[in-house]
Amino acid sequence: MKRAFILVLDSFGIGATADAKEFGDVGSDTLGHIADQCEKGLADNDKRQGALRLPNLSKLGLAMAHKESTGRFAPGLDADAEIIGAYGHAAELSSGKDTPSGHWEIAGVPVLFDWGYFTDKANSFPKELTDRILERAGLDGFLGNCHASGTQVLDDLGEEHMKTGQPIFYTSADSVFQIACHEETFGLDRLLELCQIAREELEDYNIGRVIARPFIGPGKGQFERTGNRRDLSVEPPSATVLQKLVEEKQGNVVSIGKIADIYANCGITKKVKATGIPALFEATLEQIKEAGDNTIVFTNFVDFDSAYGHRRDVAGYAAALEYFDGRINEVLELMGEDDVLILTADHGCDPTWPGTDHTREHIPVLVYGQKVPAGSLGRRETFADIGQTLASYFGTSPMDYGKNFL
C-alpha cells in the first residue's frame, strides 16, 4: 500500500539561496537565526527557555541539511544525532518567494512567469479596480489601500471599519490582495462574497491570491484574526502530481489546513479544516489512520509563517518548532512498510530579518520511510524534485520538472 504524507512547515527556511541577492535576502536563515537567538537567551518565553532543542527533527536530518545549506551547524541542534532518514536542501526555481509558487513547485509545477504585484506602499490599488469591486459589492468605500502588516492594520483601521462598514483592503510584497473584515459587524459570508468578487476582478492583474482575513474583538488592541481565513488562488498552470495521482491512479489527496485553497482545489479529493498547530497535527494523525492505498495526506502548518515569521516572533517560532518536534514521532509510529513521510517548507520567513516579508531560502527536504535509505540527498536544484519523486513513487506519468531522489 503506497501512501505519502507531506507536512509543510510554512516559512521554515534553512539558509539563503544563491539568488537571494535578487530579493534582498542575502544572509537570511530562518532556522539558523532562531537557533542563534535561543542560544543567546533572547528567545525565552512562557513556553520555552534556552537553546533550541529539536532532537527528533535532528534524527531525521534537519541539522545536517542546514549545515549543507549554510556551512554551519545551528547551535543547540544535535550534530551527532543518529540519522534515520534521508535529508537535503532544495533551491527554488520559481520566480517568487510566495506560498503558491512554493507549493506548486513542491507538486512539480514551478512558477516560471512573473506574478503581478501592487508595488506602491500607499495608494496601492488602481482606482478603476477598487471602483469595480465596490460597485459590484454594493459598498460606498473602503479603508487601507496600502502595504500593511496584517495585525497592525487591524489596530490602525479596525475600529473605523466597524463604525463605517467599509472593508480594509491591503497588500504586501507578495502577489496578494487582502481583505480584512469583522466577522460580527460585517459578516463572514459577506466577506467571502466580497473576496470572490475581487478574485474575478483581479483576473487581468495576474495576482496570485485574494485572502479573506476575518477578525473579531471589541476594539484596538483586542482584535484577533480568526481561523476562517480563506485563500482564493488561481489554478496551477499545468497538472500537479496531486492531479495526476487522482486522475491517472484514481487516488486520493487529503488537504489539511489551507492546502486546498493554495491549489485552487485542483487535485484535492477531501478537505479537512483545522486551525492552529495542535489541531492541524491531530487532524493529520486522524487522516493518516484513515488513509488507504494511493493516498497523499498533505498538511500546511501555516502558523509558523503567519503567527511567528511575519510577526518576527523568534520565541514563538522556536516554541512552535519544539512543539512540532515533540510530536513528530507520533506520525512515524503510524507509518506502514511502504509509506513515505516528507517534511519540507515553501519559502523562508526569517523572524530576525528586517521588515515582515518572506525570505528567499533553501527549504529542508527530510524524507522518512522504512524503505528509504538514510543519508544525504544533497542540494536539490528545485522544489519540484519532491513532485517528481512522488510521481515515480505512485507510478504516474512523469512531471516536466524535477528529479527523483529515491
UniProtKB/Swiss-Prot annotation:
Binding positions for Mn(2+) 2 per the UniProt entry: 305, 310, 358
Keyword Acyltransferase (UniProt): no
GO cellular component: cytosol
GO biological process entries: 2-deoxyribose 1-phosphate catabolic process; 5-phosphoribose 1-diphosphate biosynthetic process; metabolic compound salvage; nucleotide metabolic process
Enzyme Commission identifier(s): 5.4.2.7
Gene Ontology terms, MF aspect: magnesium ion binding; manganese ion binding; phosphopentomutase activity
Catalytic class of the enzyme: isomerase
Entry note: cofactor: Binds 2 manganese ions.
Binding locations of Mn(2+) 1: 10, 346-347
Domain of life: Bacteria
Gene3D superfamilies in alphabetical order: Alkaline Phosphatase, subunit A, Phosphopentomutase
Chief site of localization: cytoplasm
Catalytic activity field: 2-deoxy-alpha-D-ribose 1-phosphate = 2-deoxy-D-ribose 5-phosphate; alpha-D-ribose 1-phosphate = D-ribose 5-phosphate
Pathways per UniProt: Carbohydrate degradation; 2-deoxy-D-ribose 1-phosphate degradation; D-glyceraldehyde 3-phosphate and acetaldehyde from 2-deoxy-alpha-D-ribose 1-phosphate: step 1/2
Location(s) in or outside the cell: Cytoplasm
Keyword annotations: Cytoplasm, Isomerase, Manganese, Metal-binding
Cofactors required: Mn(2+)
Family: Belongs to the phosphopentomutase family.
HAMAP family per the UniProt record, alphabetical: Phosphopentomut
NCBIfam families hit by this protein: deoB, PRK05362.1
Task of the protein: Isomerase that catalyzes the conversion of deoxy-ribose 1-phosphate (dRib-1-P) and ribose 1-phosphate (Rib-1-P) to deoxy-ribose 5-phosphate (dRib-5-P) and ribose 5-phosphate (Rib-5-P), respectively.
Name of the protein in question: Phosphopentomutase
